Amino acid sequence: MGAEKITSKIMEDAKIQANVILAEAQKEKEALIKKAHEEAEKKKQAILKKGEKDAEMTRNRILAEARLSAKKNSLEERERTIAKAIQKLEEDLVKLPQKDEYKDILLKMIITGVYSVGGGELDLQLNKNDWKLIDDSTLWALEKEMEDRLKKVTVLKKGESLPIIGGCVVKTADKTKVSDNSLEATFERNLDIIRAKIAEMLF
């Protein structure tokens, strides 16, 4: 084999080798590019997934806050409505002594007070206007009725006038037992029941 042929053979082998190297390099390049694309896609999906998760969390938080705020506003509005209704009842309570049926109500409150302390020698306290409704004959009739019911001598003495809207306060003579049946005290004692009934009617 001549020098020229040897040189040609070397050049041909070198070219083949170079082409093999270039092909492998191209494959590696393409593999790296593909891997880079895959990595980028994975990162993209991860970012999108995190974004979706964050967005969902933000949405849920906003909805929860909105529901909480709506519930709070509803409760506040409910309380305002109940408060207005109670205020109206308090205004009506002040006007109750002016009504025709008030004397019967007052007599029942006195009887309840006498029952509560158990009869005996008692002090009856009213406001100034109500003493005009309860004269001596009415007191005597009340005493007789309570004696018959309690089977116990009962004496109702006129006590001091009180600055109350209406109703009565009944005390034993030794002041060991007191029944506050004033309109305002009765209203206050039953306020929870009143609130519940208002809520039941309105809501």
UniProtKB/Swiss-Prot annotation:
Assigned GO CC terms: plasma membrane; proton-transporting two-sector ATPase complex, catalytic domain
Locations listed in the record: Cell membrane
Topology term for the membrane: Peripheral membrane protein
Entry function: Component of the A-type ATP synthase that produces ATP from ADP in the presence of a proton gradient across the membrane.
InterPro entries the record matches: ATP_synth_B-like_membr_sf, ATPase_E_C, ATPase_V1_Esu
Main location group: membrane
Family designation: Belongs to the V-ATPase E subunit family.
Keywords: ATP synthesis, Cell membrane, Hydrogen ion transport, Ion transport, Membrane, Transport
Taxonomic lineage from the root: Archaea, Methanobacteriati, Methanobacteriota, Methanomada group, Methanococci
Superkingdom to which the source organism belongs: Archaea
GO MF terms held by the record: ATP binding; proton-transporting ATP synthase activity, rotational mechanism; proton-transporting ATPase activity, rotational mechanism
SUPFAM superfamilies reported for this sequence: F1F0 ATP synthase subunit B, membrane domain, V-type ATPase subunit E-like
Protein name according to UniProt: A-type ATP synthase subunit E
One GO BP: proton motive force-driven plasma membrane ATP synthesis
Subunit structure and binding partners: Has multiple subunits with at least A(3), B(3), C, D, E, F, H, I and proteolipid K(x).
